[in-house]
From Swiss-Prot:
Annotated TM spans: 41-61, 125-141, 153-166, 208-228, 279-295
Organism, as annotated: Acorus calamus
Keyword Disulfide bond: no
Keyword flag Heme: no
Protein name, as recorded: Photosystem II D2 protein
Enzymatic reactions: 2 a plastoquinone + 4 hnu + 2 H2O = 2 a plastoquinol + O2
Extra remark: 2 of the reaction center chlorophylls (ChlD1 and ChlD2) are entirely coordinated by water.
Listed EC numbers: 1.10.3.9
InterPro entries tied to this protein: D1/D2 (IPR055266), Photo_II_D1/D2_sf (IPR036854), Photo_RC_L/M (IPR000484), Photo_RC_L/M_CS (IPR055265), PSII_PsbD/D2 (IPR005868)
Binding site for Fe cation: 215, 269
Keywords of this entry: Acetylation, Chlorophyll, Chloroplast, Chromophore, Electron transport, Iron, Magnesium, Membrane, Metal-binding, Oxidoreductase, Phosphoprotein, Photosynthesis, Photosystem II, Plastid, Thylakoid, Transmembrane, Transmembrane helix, Transport
Length: 353
């Protein structure tokens, strides 16, 4: 019996090996397998947005001007959502709505679905890029896990929320002022600021900003060797091989300030990862709830008493009145296709009036 020892080697590389070698080659801008998803999707999403904000009107979908060509600026231009009558159509260029007519496709809001879907897959491609590079250089995948937070928010706000409503029309349009309008809509129709998931999201994002500022300041404060530079600017040398700040000193400082402090770098940095990512995920879950029209806190007893007693008001009841005002004033302008008309006497007024 013959026993062959050694490793099996293929005489010729197949197509997969050739592609793998080219895609993962060390170059200035890494491509990778994830790049096959990331780069085309990012290119089309950004290209669609620039095209829409430059040339495409929203007259046929919202009755609005939304492009530089019509006189908008960077803050007021937008790629607007399709009309409510188009419901959840993917609005493919070759679909039954546009039938291959590019101009008609733009007028119907096809660029919005184009940008939203390519944007979502572009973000997913960027997360996969972080996974791929982490594996290549033998890192843990925490960067990719952290980036799942922004992806969850994007998908929940731009895709899941309108899927739960009557159509893409109720998603945010892609523009600065358009996003502000969407925030006002969320407050008026969902009382979003009183939603506990929104509260957790705010705590996560602002808490992360606070942690970031404290951490950066503490590291700068506890440097014991800036480098061997003769002046301040050469001393902040980013190529130093070793850490030159004192965790012990930082621990002693914050122990005196708060009575407690991080004594372990891994726990400290994991906490800085955990706070914002958890906040983003919680806010995304809250938006999924809004897609199903789940309500925030309702303090009905205060509303009943405020209705019965003109002298009783709380900040909550005032906000509820403001929400009613947003709904009444906004709906007629925001949904012109409904032909809503509210007589003056039904528009909400505060107790003081």
């Amino acid at each position: 019996m013959t026993i062959a020892l050694g490793r099996f080697t293929k005489e010729e590389n197949d197509l997969f090996d050739i592609m793998d070698d080219w895609l993962r080659r060390d170059r200035f801008v890494f491509v990778g397998w994830s790049g096959l998803l990331l780069f085309p999707c990012a290119y089309f999403a950004l290209g669609g947005w620039f095209t829409g904000t430059t040339f495409v009107t929203s007259w046929y979908t919202h009755g609005l001007a939304s492009s530089y060509l019509e006189g908008c600026n960077f803050l007021t231009a937008a790629v607007s959502t399709p009309a409510n009558s188009l419901a959840h159509s993917l609005l493919l260029l070759w679909g039954p709505e546009a039938q291959g007519d590019f101009t008609r496709w733009c007028q119907l809001g096809g660029l919005w679905t184009f940008v939203a879907l390519h944007g979502a897959f572009g973000l997913i491609g960027f997360m996969l890029r972080q996974f791929e590079l982490a594996r290549s250089v033998q890192l843990r995948p925490y960067n990719a896990i952290a980036f799942s937070g922004p992806i969850a928010v994007f998908v929940s706000v731009f895709l899941i929320y309108p899927l739960g409503q009557s159509g893409w029309f109720f998603a945010p349009s892609f523009g600065v002022a358009a996003i502000f309008r969407f925030i006002l809509f969320f407050q008026g129709f969902h009382n979003w600021t009183l939603n506990p998931f929104h509260m957790m999201g705010v705590a996560g994002v602002l808490g992360a900003a606070l942690l970031c500022a404290i951490h950066g300041a503490t590291v700068e404060n506890t440097l014991f060797e800036d480098g061997d530079g003769a002046n301040t600017f050469r001393a902040f040398n980013p190529t130093q091989a070793e850490e030159t700040y004192s965790m012990v000193t930082a621990n002693r400082f914050w122990s005196q300030i708060f009575g407690v402090a991080f004594s372990n770098k891994r726990w400290l940095h994991f906490f800085m990862l955990f706070v914002p990512v958890t906040g983003l995920w919680m806010s995304a879950l809250g938006v999924v709830g809004l897609a199903l029209n789940l309500r925030a806190y309702d303090f009905v007893s205060q509303e009943i008493r405020a209705a019965e007693d003109p002298e009783f008001e709380t900040f909550y009841t005032k906000n509820i009145l403001l929400n009613e005002g947003i709904r009444a004033w906004m709906a007629a302008q925001d949904q012109p296709h409904e032909n809503l008309i509210f007589p003056e006497e039904v528009l909400p007024r505060g107790n003081a009036l």
